[in-house]
Amino acid sequence: MQLERLQKKLSYQFTNLDYLLQALTHRSAGAKNNERLEFLGDSILNFAIGKALFEKFPKANEGELSRMRATLVREQTLAILARQFGLGEYMRLGAGELKSGGYRRESILSDCVEAIIAAIYLDAGMDKAIEQVHLWYQDLLAEMKPGDAQKDPKTRLQEFLQGRKLPLPTYEVLDIKGEAHNQTFKVTCKIEMLEEIFIGIGTSRRKAEQNAAEQVLAKLTTK
């Protein structure tokens, strides 16, 4: 059975498979979808990773812990886990999402991972859900170190400019496309010391700004 293979990849056997099926169901495929599970799973994931970092780095300050957690729970990291599990093969998507390659989209994959975390919590309780998160993240957690590398691009760009007593960057939304639940933002980032205007794209304004800031940093550090 297909779900048996997935459960082996997840290293977890569900008592109630209905929880897993719901976690794999995108809103485009039906009314009983994974949106509520995603909401719950996001909270459990943040707590589980926060707990792991708190215990692993007793000398790290709040800012360092927050930045490391942000790196570990961001969409791109969750999508990497989803691909390791091969979630795209098992997800239930509506015809439109299937046609547009939704099973490859990072936002859909990451939401599914969060929904599965909530499904495990409902199936076996909080301790088991946290245990699974720690198991899935053990390699990533082993690589984490407090420090500047965990700061997001906007923070690093701001600190780069402040350290040189230069004006801060300005961000402006250039374009928003798509429906409310599936939007693409295009944002510009300008700094005084460069004539070029950098354009970032993302599924939220914040992500688009981070993308633009990353481009500016790349330009500044290769000058």
Curated annotation (Swiss-Prot):
EC identifiers of the protein: 3.1.26.3
User: Record-annotated residues binding Mg(2+)?
Assistant: E38, D111, E114
Which GO annotations describe the biological process of this protein? Answer: mRNA processing; regulation of gene expression; rRNA processing; tRNA processing
User: What region holds the DRBM domain?
Assistant: 152-222
**Keyword rRNA-binding recorded:** yes
The UniProt family comment states:
Belongs to the ribonuclease III family.
Instruction: Note the Pfam families from the entry.
Output: dsrm (PF00035), Ribonucleas_3_3 (PF14622)
Record InterPro entries: dsRBD_dom (IPR014720), RNase_III (IPR011907), RNase_III_dom (IPR000999), RNase_III_sf (IPR036389)
Does the keyword Ribonucleoprotein belong to this entry?
no
Which SUPFAM superfamilies has this protein been placed in? dsRNA-binding domain-like (SSF54768), RNase III domain-like (SSF69065)
* Subcellular location as annotated: Cytoplasm
Query: What is the protein name stated in its UniProt record?
Result: Ribonuclease 3
Q: What are the entry keywords? A: Cytoplasm, Endonuclease, Hydrolase, Magnesium, Metal-binding, mRNA processing, Nuclease, RNA-binding, rRNA processing, rRNA-binding, tRNA processing
Assembly and interactions?
Homodimer.
The record's HAMAP family line, in alphabetical order, gives: RNase_III
Catalytic activity, per the record? Endonucleolytic cleavage to 5'-phosphomonoester
A molecular function (GO) held by this record is: ribonuclease III activity
**Cofactor needs:** Mg(2+)
Q: List the disulfide bonds.
A: none
What is one GO cellular-component annotation here?
A: cytoplasm
**What is the enzyme's class at the highest EC level?**
hydrolase
> Which residues are responsible for catalysis?
D42, E114
Function, as annotated, reads:
Digests double-stranded RNA. Involved in the processing of primary rRNA transcript to yield the immediate precursors to the large and small rRNAs (23S and 16S). Processes some mRNAs, and tRNAs when they are encoded in the rRNA operon. Processes pre-crRNA and tracrRNA of type II CRISPR loci if present in the organism.
Q: What lineage is on file? A: Bacteria, Pseudomonadati, Pseudomonadota, Gammaproteobacteria, Pasteurellales
Chain ranges of the RNase III domain: 3-125
